[in-house]
């Protein structure tokens, strides 16, 4: 939450309006500069510093570093998302090599098109693509951590956690308006990860990671 507020403060100082459609951000040139500066710089390095303080050897990366993640700019359809990337290639061997060396990659939600341009990329997509790539080398559990205890039936009731959800239930909840906004791409990424060999996906609060709480996606 501090990260999101921090980014919002930068938007305001720069006179930039943040626009979202269906839980996905519209990224113009000015927005891309801010996202790259904040998420590729300040936020990423603060996370790395925090992990180092805990004795965890972490390395902060964007998709451009060592050609980790290549994307294509999303084509204009009903909505023009601007400088947003759809991931096309992940350097799975690089990620696996870092982990084998005891290095924890900290990935910013930024990719590149291999033509010299950075692209804003949904953070859940980054996590999902990394998990899918690593599933070729390891047994992977993908965990999405955010401010809620899991996927909620009632967004105003933090205790209304849906313990398990499959594709059929997901589609029904979306149609009924129970699941909306940013939770939709989060769950879409979850199902794609499972299809690609990820063992399981858990959506929960960071504080509940080791408690077995949250929503299991299968």
Show which residues each predicted segment covers:
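Single conserved hydrophobic/aromatic residue that forms the stacking wall/gate
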Residues: 1-11
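Ligand-binding beta-strand-loop-alpha-helix segment within the catalytic cores
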Residues: 12-106
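Glycine-rich phosphate/pyrophosphate-binding loops
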Residues: 59-62, 68-69, 135-152, 201-205
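Anionic-ligand binding region
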Residues: 80-98, 112-116, 124-135
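Active-site rim beta-loop-alpha module in soluble metabolic enzymes
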Residues: 97-118, 146-167
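Residue-level preference for the first positions of well-ordered beta-strands
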Residues: 102-106, 141, 200
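Short, basic/aromatic-enriched C-terminal tail that caps enzymatic domains
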Residues: 209-218
């Amino acid at each position: 939450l501090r990260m999101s507020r921090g980014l919002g403060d930068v938007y305001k100082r720069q006179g930039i309006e943040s626009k979202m459609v269906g839980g996905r951000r519209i990224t113009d040139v000015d927005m891309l500069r801010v996202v790259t500066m904040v998420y590729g710089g300040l936020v990423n390095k603060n996370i790395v510093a925090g992990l180092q303080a805990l004795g965890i050897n972490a390395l902060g990366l964007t998709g451009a570093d060592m050609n980790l993640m290549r994307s294509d700019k999303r084509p204009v359809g009903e909505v023009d998302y601007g400088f947003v990337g759809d991931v096309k290639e992940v350097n799975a061997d690089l990620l696996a090599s870092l982990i084998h060396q005891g290095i924890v990659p900290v990935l910013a939600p930024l990719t590149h098109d291999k033509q010299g341009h950075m692209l804003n990329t949904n953070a859940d997509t980054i996590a999902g693509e990394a998990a899918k790539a690593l599933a070729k080398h390891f047994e992977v559990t993908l965990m999405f951590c955010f401010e809620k205890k899991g996927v909620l039936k009632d967004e105003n009731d933090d205790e209304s956690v849906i313990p398990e959800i499959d594709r059929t239930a997901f589609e029904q909840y979306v149609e009924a308006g129970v699941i909306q906004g940013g939770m939709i791409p989060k769950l879409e990424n979850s199902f794609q990860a499972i299809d690609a060999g990820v063992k399981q996906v858990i959506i929960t609060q960071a504080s509940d990671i080791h408690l077995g709480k949250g929503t299991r996606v299968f």
